[in-house]
Amino acid sequence: MALWGGRFTQAADGRFKQFNDSLRFDYRLAEQDIIGSVAWSKALVTVGVLTAQEQSQLEGALNTLLEEVLENPHAILESDAEDIHSWVEGKLIDKVGPLGKKLHTGRSRNDQVATDLKLWCKTQVHALLSATRQLQQALVVTAEENQDAVMPGYTHLQRAQPVTFAHWCLAYVEMLARDESRLKDTLKRLDVSPLGSGALAGTAYEIDREQLAGWLGFASATRNSLDSVSDRDHVLELLSDAAISMVHLSRFAEDLIFFNSGEAGFVELSDRVTSGSSLMPQKKNPDALELIRGKCGRVQGALTGMMMTLKGLPLAYNKDMQEDKEGLFDALDTWLDCLHMAALVLDGIQVKRPRCQEAAQQGYANATELADYLVAKGVPFREAHHIVGEAVVEAIRQGKPLEDLALGDLQKFSPVISDDVYPVLSLQSCLDKRAAQGGVSPVQVAQAISAAKARLA
């Protein structure tokens, strides 16, 4: 049943109907559409459109319909209704007869769909917040178990300075904490009800929109009806939140793909999140991580697509805005799946401590310590930097790490070097000296783990 047929003398072309209909994806808003309709029926009682008895009958039928939807949401797709609003109204009329035709009084699909989508987004935000926190907790657990796993830190994919696997985990805890903060901030602006804004100019019935917003669980009602039906900022914000977080997850995946490679060999992934090759029997591929990395692209595309859809639209509802849902649904589903999968990857990961330590001792990752040692002896840092560079060249020539160079060889580059340099060049010394807030020292890492556990409790 179309909701707009009276103006037309010809039926819609079947090809146009297929092109125009949105039920195949907006069926996901069924629960929210029914909840919004129940609240609207209560509002219509306050302005005398419905009697209390009529409202009770409508609410009972809508609640029954909601139970049916929750039991089998995909049954909606068997209908040829134009959209979820048409489907709900048609089912309601089937249940209560002509009374169902009164429900849409004073309401437009424009404020109806805006309300449905905001309600759906609120539910998704809470699910995403939970998943984001769960992944942070998984990272903290992994960090706590690997505080003593020393590994090389990288810049430009070259060994730079020693860190610990725990410190690496905690870096992603910080990124995800920002993702969590962005979601919470988005929720503040999302938590405003557009219902009662009508098509664009407001409803002709003196409904208490603040009361209506409260019935729906919103913090308040919107202040301008034209903005209310035009606004899709919450879609853009959520897609932006998703895009940023997926970049974090993609970097997490890329790091672990490298750590898991035969060339690095720092970790081994669980069989539960890897797959094999149809040709090469020896292969154990990090497919879960590669898919997280790959799915990042589709989320960035959804954000870009929505920006382009909205950029040229005049105010109020335009059919272009029907394009807000598929990309949003897919992006948030993808983000949620990737958060869960990242946590699963951590569950069962094995850190190969001997190999990590071996790699940390290679590549002259302690060169900065030698420079700091020289600074402590009164050598200006820029001069110390040059001296250490020359010492590294000599160590490479001899095929030795810095700490294995003879004292005489080191003193060729600076006479201030004495035998007290060797303890400074040890891995443990490299870590211990990074004791400022946020550093990689064992004390700082332990404090960071405790703080993260307290925040996430």
UniProtKB/Swiss-Prot annotation:
Protein location: Cytoplasm
Listed pathway(s): Amino-acid biosynthesis; L-arginine biosynthesis; L-arginine from L-ornithine and carbamoyl phosphate: step 3/3
PROSITE patterns found in the cross-reference section: FUMARATE_LYASES
EC number(s) given by UniProt: 4.3.2.1
Domain of life, per lineage: Bacteria
GO MF, one example: argininosuccinate lyase activity
GO cellular component: a single term: cytosol
Catalytic activity: 2-(N(omega)-L-arginino)succinate = fumarate + L-arginine
Similarity comment: Belongs to the lyase 1 family. Argininosuccinate lyase subfamily.
HAMAP family: Arg_succ_lyase
Protein name: Argininosuccinate lyase
Gene designation: argH
